[in-house]
Amino acid sequence: MNETELKALLSRIRPADSAAKAAAKERQSKLAKPPGSLGALEEISVRLAGITGRVCNRIEKTRIVVFAADNGIVAEGVASTPQCVTLAQAINMTRGKTGMSAIARDFGIDVEVIDVGINSDSVPETILDRKLGFGTANFSKQPAMTRSQAVDALAIGIEAAERAHNSGADALGIGEMGIGNTTTSAAVLACLLNLPVESVTGRGSGLTDEGFALKKRVISDALALHKPNGADVLDVLSKVGGFDIAAMAGAFIGCALFCLPPVAGGLVFLFAALAAVRLCKTVRDFIFLSHASYEIGYRAAAAELGMEPWLNLNMRLGEGSGCPVAFQVMRAACAAMNDMATFEEASINDNYLENIRNESAFCVKTV
């Protein structure tokens, strides 16, 4: 895929189905409960209707796709974890032995791990090979990747979403594995939102004070060197991004293209989602946020999208670890929408709710 083909593909993405959303809100108003009493579950069911075009939905078959890649910037000492852990954990994901994959296995969720840039030539066949390189370049010295590679990474993500759609998945969780990607994601967010590096950079997996100061300095120096254009997502991704972030952005785009509900599972995923929305604002209609990340920068990105995560569990693992839990929330939303009785079916006169219905504070809100 080249940039012209990417633009043509983005032009095919259509907004959420407003008629289906309106019909879903109408059904919510007839269910035997006080208006708005199921809170976010009502909003989720309405947004799902907009994505699928159906008022009633089921979230039965789910998948989490993990994009694994190394980041050359770790050569600058910005990560406390050795780079070899990327491959080790990618393998462990295929065995159900990481945080995300253990939870996913317990819930019966399919996990697909894709190598988009692991720095190893000994990646097992249980990991899908879509390698774009042996990690990105060290962006403190040169651009992380070429624009062509950034587009290729987006295409890999789009392909993964299409594959999930074709497999019959009802929702797709987006995951990652890549030592150093809190550094790349902070650099990307600082560019996209034009924010100071200090306000979007966290400690990652546990840097010391000295390491944390180094991390912020490395990012600041790289931004000064490359001067990424925040209005050009491909410029930002190619200069200071990662293969995993670009592929995740592509997965969000692919989900919008194939009307498959995607879940952003935490910090790095949210930044990738923001990049996808900057490429095509309509993608926002299709994104769900599972849980608030403990890491700094999450709030700024969520506010930019105008979205709130469903859960606050003080999580900061990454991997897409919030997605398995989020799928259960989506199932709950669908169960209420599909299976609750209406006032008429429950033989309840709902006239007593008229005043409550007239109060906007109790209306179903959708983003």
Regions found by a protein language model. Name each.
Residues 1-367:
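N-terminal loops that bind phosphate or other acidic moieties
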